[in-house]
UniProtKB/Swiss-Prot annotation:
<dbReference type="InterPro" id="IPR019888">
    <property type="entry name" value="Tscrpt_reg_AsnC-like"/>
</dbReference>
<dbReference type="InterPro" id="IPR011008">
    <property type="entry name" value="Dimeric_a/b-barrel"/>
</dbReference>
<dbReference type="Pfam" id="PF01037">
    <property type="entry name" value="AsnC_trans_reg"/>
</dbReference>
<keyword id="KW-0804">Transcription</keyword>
<protein>
    <recommendedName>
        <fullName>Uncharacterized HTH-type transcriptional regulator PYRAB01370</fullName>
    </recommendedName>
</protein>
<dbReference type="InterPro" id="IPR000485">
    <property type="entry name" value="AsnC-type_HTH_dom"/>
</dbReference>
<dbReference type="InterPro" id="IPR019887">
    <property type="entry name" value="Tscrpt_reg_AsnC/Lrp_C"/>
</dbReference>
<keyword id="KW-0805">Transcription regulation</keyword>
<dbReference type="InterPro" id="IPR011991">
    <property type="entry name" value="ArsR-like_HTH"/>
</dbReference>
<dbReference type="InterPro" id="IPR036390">
    <property type="entry name" value="WH_DNA-bd_sf"/>
</dbReference>
<feature type="domain" description="HTH asnC-type">
    <location>
        <begin position="12"/>
        <end position="73"/>
    </location>
</feature>
<dbReference type="Pfam" id="PF13412">
    <property type="entry name" value="HTH_24"/>
</dbReference>
<dbReference type="GO" id="GO:0005829">
    <property type="term" value="C:cytosol"/>
</dbReference>
<feature type="DNA-binding region" description="H-T-H motif">
    <location>
        <begin position="31"/>
        <end position="50"/>
    </location>
</feature>
<dbReference type="GO" id="GO:0043565">
    <property type="term" value="F:sequence-specific DNA binding"/>
</dbReference>
<keyword id="KW-0238">DNA-binding</keyword>
<dbReference type="InterPro" id="IPR036388">
    <property type="entry name" value="WH-like_DNA-bd_sf"/>
</dbReference>
Amino acid sequence: MIRVAHSRKVQLDEIDRAILRLLQEDGRMSYSEISRRINVPESTVRARVNRLIREGVIRKFAALINPFKAGYEIVAFIAIDAEPAKVRQVVEELAKLPEVDVLGIVTGAHDIFMQVTVRDLQELERFILEKMAKIDGIRSTETSILTSVKKWGYARVF
């Protein structure tokens, strides 16, 4: 499981941030192109990217896919109330499910919040009534379906 909230913070300077911004624009951008754009040696870019990977700032390089264009009609946000002693256990089980895109323990009215992507309403129903129902410790859920997208981004680098 990815531990985000309590991870050790990595010091980023302006060169690191510039590299990260460019890679977020185009993850396939070559080190030589990044080097040219930010006016530092290619060896510096290569060393910085390797350090950012090693320190966990860059988790992986992947395509950012539009789920709707790829045949997934439903993006849903599910708030979960769990038995207090089983919150972590519930999260560990939910993390194993391929439909789950984002998952975390939260503050506020619920214990756990997640984003799931499925092909249609029937698949969402099966996910909730069959897969989630098997997980011990879930007391209740509240599901909201995304009806339109105004912005779909990723972690910003300040």
